[in-house]
């Protein structure tokens, strides 16, 4: 028997995802047509022996999250439950706090997945590796170039046994080109080191004259408190993958992740990809169109376009490398490139909404998405354009490399600006 835990964080996280995270929790943001964590759940549900999927985070269990859980249980015929932390507990604190729920039924092992990663999730291969070794911790790793590796947790492995000999989270100097993917497979014994960290935190933080538990003791960071401490002790191993992988920290990385998932649909979900039909819009490359969307026959879509529920796309519209969210309207002859159009937004006739992609270097097979910074030397850096919820763009204007916060009605063109 197996279980899976998806760490979804909380509203104090995902600030780089604004203004998109104003409307829905970041883990529910649509990537390639479905909520971000649905890709995780689909992968977990395909592992033989999977009995339960647990979501752990600090979000309030509001209506969108509750509806998603109900729909996921029906679609995958698996218990999918949300466990809310009493406070933000870090990447390992929630695992220890809810250890009884995780270990209920005596699972052989349990997967732990961070919500903000895009991957092909080689979970079955990880399970095979785990069953050969039977060690407490198995990490999924991939490679990055020397410069970008400093932005991730870096792993030094024994190339023969794949034991993790050294682990450093975001080192200041080059350690290794093997990086942590944020996807793990733990044995039940893996919770014992978390207990040790909790007890040590309790001893360090407790004052002599303050009875009871120190509230900060429950905060446990898997990367710094567990992986770094146990590396080289024969407990942590790494499974390397050369499949797709990317973090989803910002809106720009969500657009890149959408492209990766759309390309995977050719093998995993070909029914989700739109096809050119007589009397329908022209489709170029991988495109997702929700069944309720209305798209004019003269529109040209793709590559790498995702169109959400209830979207209206008018005559002569050109869409490329973009996400158009629920209820948005693109009027006649608009052009949307490298952008995200928010829920219920309207782009007027002959308007142009365009951003600048921040993709990995295509000439470097180990390149990853750079950590996006909005500003450099006091200037807004070119990036994808984001229209927040219910933004109105008038006809015949240009919105270039800009971020428009929700409920704004513009009257002119903007370039390289954040419109508050």
From Swiss-Prot:
PROSITE patterns: HEXAPEP_TRANSFERASES. Residues 356-384 are annotated as: C-loop. GO terms for biological process: biosynthetic process. Residues 273-420 are annotated as: Hexapeptide repeat domain. InterPro entries: GMPPB_C, Hexapep_transf_CS, Mannose-1P_guanyltransferase, NTP_transferase_dom, Nucleotide-diphossugar_trans. GO terms for molecular function: transferase activity. Its main location: cytoplasm. GDP-alpha-D-mannose binds at residues 85, 247. It is found in: Cytoplasm. Residues 2-251 are annotated as: Substrate-binding domain. It comes from the Eukaryota. The N-terminal substrate-binding domain adopts a Rossman-like fold and has a binding pocket for GTP or GDP-alpha-D-mannose. Component of the GMPPA-GMPPB mannose-1-phosphate guanylyltransferase complex composed of 4 GMPPA subunits and 8 GMPPB subunits; the complex is organized into three layers, a central layer made up of 2 GMPPA dimers sandwiched between two layers each made up of 2 GMPPB dimers. This is Mannose-1-phosphate guanylyltransferase regulatory subunit alpha. It comes from Papio anubis (Olive baboon). The gene is GMPPA.
């Amino acid at each position: 028997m197996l279980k899976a835990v998806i760490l979804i964080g909380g509203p104090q996280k995902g600030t780089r995802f604004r203004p998109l995270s104003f409307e829905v929790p970041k883990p529910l943001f649509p990537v390639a047509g479905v909520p971000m964590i649905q890709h995780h759940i689909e992968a977990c549900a395909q592992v033989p022996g999977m009995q339960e999927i647990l979501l752990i985070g600090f979000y309030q269990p509001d209506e969108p999250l509750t509806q998603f859980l109900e729909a996921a249980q029906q679609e995958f015929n698996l218990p999918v439950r949300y466990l809310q932390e009493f406070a933000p507990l870090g990447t390992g604190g929630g695992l220890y706090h809810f250890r009884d729920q995780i270990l209920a039924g005596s699972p052989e092992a349990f997967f732990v997945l961070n919500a903000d990663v895009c991957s092909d999730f080689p979970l079955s291969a990880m399970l095979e590796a785990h069953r050969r070794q039977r060690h407490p911790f198995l990490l999924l790793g991939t490679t990055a170039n020397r410069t970008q590796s400093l932005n991730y947790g870096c792993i030094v492995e024994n190339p023969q046994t794949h034991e993790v000999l050294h682990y450093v989270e975001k080192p200041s100097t080059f350690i290794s080109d093997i990086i942590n993917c944020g996807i793990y497979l733990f044995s039940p014994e893996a919770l014992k080191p978390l207990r040790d960290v909790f007890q040590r935190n309790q001893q360090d933080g407790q004052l002599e004259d303050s009875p009871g538990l120190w509230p900060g003791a429950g905060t446990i960071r898997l990367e710094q408190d567990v992986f770094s401490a146990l590396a080289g002790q024969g407990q942590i191993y790494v499974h390397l993958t050369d499949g797709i992988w990317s973090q989803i920290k910002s809106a720009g990385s969500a657009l890149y992740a959408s492209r990766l998932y759309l390309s995977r649909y050719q093998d995993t979900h070909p029914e989700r990809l739109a096809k050119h039909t007589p009397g329908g819009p022209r489709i170029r490359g991988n495109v997702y169109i929700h069944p309720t969307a209305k798209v004019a026959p003269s529109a040209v879509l793709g590559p790498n376009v995702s169109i959400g529920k209830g979207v209206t796309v008018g005559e002569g519209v050109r869409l490329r490398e973009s996400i158009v969210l629920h209820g948005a309207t693109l009027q006649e002859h608009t052009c949307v490139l490298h952008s995200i159009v928010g829920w219920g937004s309207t782009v007027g006739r002959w308007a142009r909404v365009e951003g600048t992609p921040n993709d990995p270097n295509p000439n470097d097979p180990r390149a990853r998405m750079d950590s996006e910074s909005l500003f450099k030397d006091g200037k807004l850096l070119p990036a994808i354009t984001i229209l927040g919820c219910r933004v109105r763009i008038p006809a015949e204007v240009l919105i270039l490399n800009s971020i428009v916060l929700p409920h704004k009605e513009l009257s002119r063109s903007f370039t390289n600006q954040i419109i508050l």
